[in-house]
Curated annotation (Swiss-Prot):
Gene label: smpd5
Site (Important for substrate recognition): N404
UniProt GO cellular component terms: cytoplasm; endoplasmic reticulum membrane; extracellular region; mitochondrial inner membrane; mitochondrial intermembrane space; mitochondrial membrane
Pathway where it operates: Lipid metabolism; sphingolipid metabolism
Regulation of this protein's activity per its record: Activated by the phospholipids cardiolipin, phosphatidylserine, and phosphatidylethanolamine. Strongest activation with cardiolipin.
Residue ranges, Mitochondrial intermembrane side: 86-545
GO molecular function, one term: sphingomyelin phosphodiesterase activity
Protein name as annotated: Sphingomyelin phosphodiesterase 5
Length: 545
């Protein structure tokens, strides 16, 4: 079955929707600029101090007046557009689908799958904080449109690099060697991270730039020092783990969260489409939900975004009904997708399932997140039962996203004990409330996003690799109210909050293992989360009869 690209059943309704949104957008944009002109990121404040720029108060005053006047003028047109736009949400499919032919090549890691008796798949999840610019600044991030384009092109450049494997004598340093320099333009002495000295993001890098290739000949006379591997294989790690300044190669499916801004979603789609020919974006519902009810009005979609190399056979979105506070304004939920891997074993076609979610955010609302975990566990099972066919062979079932709770905070004990962790395997989890010792937190402290140790992919990589450094830049565990926090326990490493998850469940009796797990620092200065990727290896010879 092929998905329809438009979220509307015909072009007439799609046109009406475009007219309605066209009337709303100027008012929305003026309000966004009104907020943005009043809020500076720490990067912009640092730049003004360095440049001794004292005109900013005038910019705030006159900019606020200008955008407020324009906002008021555009409001009547927005109300007219809203009358046209809102009723159409009841018949809108809760996602848009983009499909195009792949024009950027990627290494095929499964060319010899029949000979090897196994097949592997790469997955990536990241919260990219692509909110409207004014709101993103509350998270110390701005320039949403430029960030979206750079994020998309950075992903493409990272995942299309070759997978090179070398062998070294050290028992703790072997694996894939990758270039340590960022593909985002490197800052000069007066700049901060992926942003130049003027406080503006650099122009988007070209997709067809050639990625620098490492010298993998250890005996080369041209190499004064051995190449610094981006793979950090810890001696006590039970799976290969690395902190990498580049996205891992040959990622098959990318799942993003907080892609709330529609224009940013389109820029991501334009950047990723030539490589990932199947993209789901603008996922979620708007206006009154459920349709016809005024109990909950959704100003934002779910923020979920999925890009896949594999054709999408079926897709379904469900909205969590129990959001509260500011989270109730967004249609957070679960996106469940079935993909066609494009291979066959005997008479059976290989397929896979990917589930992407973003749970309730406010701390202290563990009961809400626990109920949302109940829902997603039920919904994933229902979707797979409904869309399972006898002539298909499911090979993977992955659940990923921003869960907004970790496995080390006393305040998150309720969610840590949920049965979803019995259904799915978390490769970073030792037990409820206890991480494996090599795990690294993924939630960055927002005030320090542009610190010297955070401002470039290489610097952030070194920070994450050092326990002494990362405890200053990764969010610490959340204590129970009124109970002093003792963390870490004696003889245990400092880990921090890991709220971005990649979980998997074995399918059809095939043994599934994590081939490699990667913490990615390539988006330094572009988001307040650490992207996480893993590669699953599925054995095709272990099917239980």
């Amino acid at each position: 079955m092929s998905l329809r690209e438009s979220p509307f059943p015909n072009g007439f309704l799609e046109g009406l929707h475009a007219v309605g949104w066209g009337l709303i957008f100027p008012c929305f944009w003026f309000l966004d600029r009104l907020i943005a002109v009043c809020i500076s990121t720490t990067l912009e404040r640092m730049w003004r101090l360095e440049q001794e720029c004292y005109l900013h108060p005038l910019k705030v005053v006159f900019g606020s007046i200008l955008f407020f006047i324009l906002f008021v003028i555009s409001t009547p047109f927005a109300l007219l557009g809203f009358i046209l736009w809102a009723p159409l949400q009841a018949i809108r499919r809760p996602f848009s689908y983009h499909k195009q032919e792949q024009s950027i090549p990627m290494e095929n890691r499964n060319a010899r799958w029949e000979e090897m008796g196994k097949i592997s798949f790469g997955f990536l999840t990241a919260n990219v904080c692509l909110l409207p610019d004014g709101i993103a600044r509350f998270n110390n991030l701005g320039h949403t449109q430029k960030r979206a384009l750079i994020i998309g092109k950075s992903i493409v450049q990272g995942v299309t690099r070759p997978h090179i494997r070398i062998f070294v004598d050290s028992p703790s340093s072997c694996g894939t060697v990758t270039p340590s320099s960022s593909l985002i333009p490197q800052p000069n002495a007066s700049s901060y991270g992926s942003v130049d000295a003027s406080g503006e993001l650099p122009d988007a890098i070209e997709v067809n730039e050639i990625t620098p290739k490492p010298n993998c000949n250890q005996n080369s006379n041209h190499q004064k020092h051995p190449p610094r591997s981006l793979r950090t294989l810890l001696r006590d790690a039970d799976i290969p783990m690395e902190v990498s300044a580049l996205f891992p190669p040959s990622v098959d499916i990318v799942c993003l969260q907080e892609v709330f801004d529609k224009r940013a979603a389109r820029k991501l789609t334009q950047a990723l489409g030539p490589l990932y020919g199947h993209v789901l974006y603008d996922v979620g519902v708007y206006a009154c939900h459920p349709a016809g009810s005024c109990s909950s009005f959704k100003f934002f979609n779910s923020g979920l975004f999925l890009a896949s190399r594999f054709p999408i056979m079926e897709a379904e979105y469900r909205c969590f009904p129990n959001g509260r506070g500011e989270d109730a304004l967004a249609a957070k939920g679960l996106l469940t997708v079935k993909v066609d891997i494009g291979l066959q074993k005997g008479e059976k076609r290989m397929v896979g399932f990917i589930n992407c979610t973003h749970l309730h955010a406010p701390e202290g609302d563990g009961a809400i997140r626990f109920e949302q975990l109940n829902m997603l566990s039920k919904w994933t099972s229902e979707f797979q039962t409904l869309n399972r066919r006898d002539d298909e062979l499911p090979l993977f079932d992955v659940l990923c996203g921003d869960f907004n709770f970790d496995n080390c905070s006393p305040d998150d004990r309720l969610e840590q004990s949920h049965s979803v962790f019995d259904e799915y395997t978390d490769p970073c989890r030792a037990a409820a409330g206890k991480e494996k010792p090599w795990v690294i937190g993924t939630l960055l402290e927002q005030p320090t996003l542009y610190d010297e140790n955070m401002r470039t992919p290489d610097n952030l990589q070194r920070t994450l690799e050092s326990e002494d450094l990362r405890k200053d830049f990764i969010s610490p565990p959340v204590a129970l109210d009124g109970v002093p926090l003792v963390y870490p326990e004696a003889d245990q490493p400092w880990i921090g909050r890991r709220i971005d998850y990649l979980l998997y469940r074995e399918k059809s009796g095939h043994r599934t293992e994590v081939e490699e797990l990667t913490y990615v620092t390539q988006l330094a200065g572009l988001t307040d989360h650490i992207p996480v990727g893993f590669r699953l290896s599925v054995s095709l010879d272990s099917e239980q009869n």
